[in-house]
Amino acid sequence: MKIKYNSPTVLTFAFASASVLVLSQTIMRTLTMEWFMVPGKGGFFPASFRNWITLFTHVLGHANWPHLVSNFSFILLIGPILEEIYGSFPVFIMISITALVTGVLNVLFFSSGLLGASGVVFMMILLASFTNFSKGEIPLTFILVLVLYLGRELFISFGNNTDSNISEFAHIVGGFIGSLFGFFRLPRGTHR
């Protein structure tokens, strides 16, 4: 029996994120802060090449192991299914778009930096609820996931805990992007 690299985009994403965290906690202590965290409002400098890169790379950075394990428990569970349905390159594009949108919105609206793949997790959760989507129908699973996950995040974000509003914001945006991909992106080999 041999081990198969069955989900190239998701596995590469997971290994890259773990590598960034290992390096950040051992020999390159400032790696995450410098290259894998998008700055907040007032900290983004358009002339800085690094700032532009972090609009995409912040999803690879994580604060610690519980943060990474929490995100990749979902990504490694849902991601391979999505990669099978949509293909490796489209899933890579979806992850990249989610990273860019959450990064840009963080720069525009929040003063704190942003790192982690939480927006990608919520994009995948909402996108996965569209696996049985057909023209003219909205899956009940999508509605339930929307109410449960995004409703919870909205409730938390409007609470008194201002320290966590940024991550809830990334969750909400990621879920919204996943919903859009679900509505407009066709699985491989299907037509609406």
Residues covered by each model-derived region:
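A detector for small-residue-rich transmembrane helices and their helix-helix packing motifs
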Residues: 1-192
